[in-house]
Amino acid sequence: MARLTYLGHAAFQLEAGGRKILVDPWLSNPKSPVKPEEVEGVDLIVITHSHFDHLGDVGKIAAKNPGAKVLAVYEVADLAAEEIAKETGASKDELFNAGRVIGANIGGPVVLQDLGLKVAFTPATHSSVGVAAGAVIITGEGRVYHAGDTGVTMDMRLVGEIYKPHVALLPIGGHFTMDPVEAAKAVELIRPLVAIPMHYGTFPVLYGDPEEFKKRVEEKCLPTQVRILKPGESYEFDFSKA
């Protein structure tokens, strides 16, 4: 059984196959139930893009968890390595050469054999130093798509067709990302079994309402269940036989 825990804003913790994965670890966000220095046992940190609310506290968390790997699109990985170097004293070259920081790109999955995981970066429509992306995390219990920050795009249909994510984590806040209307369209394109809204309510400008998102998805009569998680709440799943 895998467990997905919402840590506020766009941050999630995924526990699957005995591994602990963090995505977009801005744990100093005002909604987070845990502080960066409290997180232990992390195996992998996935970062979708370089904005402060996604690159987040990667330096502090990686320093606290010396066994954790950090995975991102290459230029974003380079920025993450800078943050880790500040906290640990290791050079960027040392971090890359030791495999602690891994640069990748949009395309086929990155195979992490020692963790029993695959991660595929997918297109996202957003600004970033380096390329903004989404990420599909492929585990034995199921496939989780974290869309990162993005507007709705027809590439999402390809994400659904190729990776068939069981769970989709979608921004709904508007202004910088999709709003509930666009996010509901994204669900229609991706067709996951479960959709979980994120990236709303952290700041006044992120006006998207998760209940409106749920209503608009239900109006489309899709085979998708919307689960609204409060920060600190978890969703457990096992789609290994789905």
From Swiss-Prot:
Pfam families: Lactamase_B_2. InterPro entries: Metallo-B-lactamas (IPR001279), RibonucZ/Hydroxyglut_hydro (IPR036866), UPF0173 (IPR022877), UPF0173_UPF0282_UlaG_hydrolase (IPR050114). It comes from Aeropyrum pernix (strain ATCC 700893 / DSM 11879 / JCM 9820 / NBRC 100138 / K1). GO terms for molecular function: hydrolase activity. Keywords: Hydrolase. Transmembrane segments: none annotated. Gene3D superfamilies: Ribonuclease Z/Hydroxyacylglutathione hydrolase-like. The keyword Nucleotidyltransferase does not apply. Belongs to the UPF0173 family. The keyword Hydrolase applies. It comes from the Archaea. This is UPF0173 metal-dependent hydrolase APE_1117. Disulfide bonds: none annotated.
